[in-house]
Amino acid sequence: MKRKLLMLTALALCLALLCGCTTIATSEWMQNLFPVGDEAVAAQQTGSVNGSEDKQEVKQVVTETYTALESFGLAYQPDYGLQPYNCQSLNNRIIFSFLYEPLFAVTSSYEAEPILAESYFVTDDGRTTTVKLRSGVTFHDGSALTAADAAYSIESAAGSEYYGSRLRFITSAEAQDDLTLVLSTSEAYECLPLLLDIPIIKSGTKDEVSPPGTGPYEFAETKLTRCENWWRDTAPLVDFDEIALTVSSTAADVRDNFEYQKVNMVL
């Protein structure tokens, strides 16, 4: 039952990842996934059936208690790679939540929450959005995050099949200075920050096996290792020195590794 609950929770994460969400979405599901101490979970939902207005109550109660994990593992499908803008493996996209962070994340109330960004301003005509980045943010290699990196990431994402549709109205992404990004759109787009929950990578690295990000972990072939110089002064929500990556080439491999508890989340 516990592992079914983990899978259901992972599916919730999947929906966020498909939209590009990372940090805030990750925060919400992680808090539910890793409770402190023994805990039982009960959930109740009310919804319509077959589109009708009649609502039926659906109850699901998990009676098993469990404790926090002593180790953590993820499924890894190496054939799909870890390029955040083109990777089509949903399991690999879970890994991105540990490697990368966005300019903004979308909250449960559908508001843009600054992550790597500090603030933003939209002109009266809605066609220019200026984003001010946080200072002191660094990539895994120790280099500082700049507006040029953010512009490169947005341009790379806009040219990809995965993110191209959502970013199609952006006509230019330019660094005004080291911490100021200016985005122009072909039409009024006052809510553009809601679409900027995409992974930010270091400029010029999109074709690398695992482009440097700003997240709490970095890729090390068979595992993720904690970034010792992570720019935040708080511990990550998934707080392990290492996260094992178990090669799972096929859907059957993913299923088996999950059932045998080699990995803790699958999609």
Report each predicted region and the residues it spans:
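Bacterial lipoprotein signal-peptidase II cleavage site
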Residues: 22-30
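N-terminal lobe/hinge region of extracytoplasmic solute-binding protein
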Residues: 73-124, 155
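Gly/Pro-rich hinge or "lid" segments in bacterial periplasmic/extracellular proteins
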Residues: 184, 189-244, 249-252
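Short, well-ordered beta-strand elements
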Residues: 60-78, 128-131, 150-153, 181-183, ...
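Aromatic- and charge-enriched surface segment that lines or borders ligand/interaction sites
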Residues: 118-161, 259
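Extracellular/periplasmic solute-recognition and catalytic clefts
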Residues: 157, 220-223, 246-267
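Surface-exposed ligand-recognition segments of extracellular binding domains, strongest
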Residues: 110-138, 168-205
